[in-house]
Regions:
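Phosphate-binding and adjacent anionic-ligand microenvironments
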Residues: 1-117
C-alpha cells in the first residue's frame, strides 16, 4: 500500500471490470454463494470487513458476492446472457492495489467454482 494514506481522498478511486469464462453450472454456483464460501480473511493486504450477498439498503439478493475492505472491494456475479462471470473491483489507493484485489478475487472465485458440484 502507499506510504501516504491521507492522499487517498485526493487521488480518487481506481476501478475495473473483468470477464472470465464460466459454464452454466459455474454461473449457477456463483449466484448461490454465501459468506461462508469465502475462506479468506484478507483482500489486497487488508482485513475483510464484510462479505455480502444482499444489498445493504433493501436486503435484496445481489446475485453474487461482494467482499469489502476499508480501502477496496470486489463483487463477482454471473452474466445472465453470456458464458462468463464478471468481477467488478475498486481500490481507493492506486492501480497496483486494484490489480492485487483483482488477482486475489480471480483466484478466490476460480477456487470456489472449481469445487462446484
Amino acid at each position: 500500500m502507499p506510504a501516504w494514506p491521507e492522499k487517498r481522498n485526493y487521488i480518487g478511486s481506481h476501478a475495473k471490470r473483468i470477464d472470465a469464462p464460466a459454464n452454466a453450472r459455474q454461473r449457477a454456483r456463483l449466484g448461490r454463494l454465501s459468506p461462508k464460501d469465502v475462506p479468506i480473511s484478507e483482500l489486497g493486504g487488508e482485513k475483510i470487513e464484510a462479505v455480502l450477498t444482499t444489498a445493504p439498503g433493501d436486503g435484496n439478493p445481489i446475485g453474487g458476492i461482494k467482499v469489502v475492505t476499508h480501502d477496496g472491494w470486489f463483487a463477482a456475479r454471473p452474466s445472465g446472457t453470456e458464458d462468463v462471470y464478471k468481477i467488478y473491483a475498486e481500490s481507493f489507493w492506486d492501480h497496483d492495489h486494484l490489480r492485487r484485489i483483482q488477482q486475489e478475487a480471480q483466484a478466490l472465485i476460480a477456487q470456489v467454482l472449481q469445487a462446484a458440484p
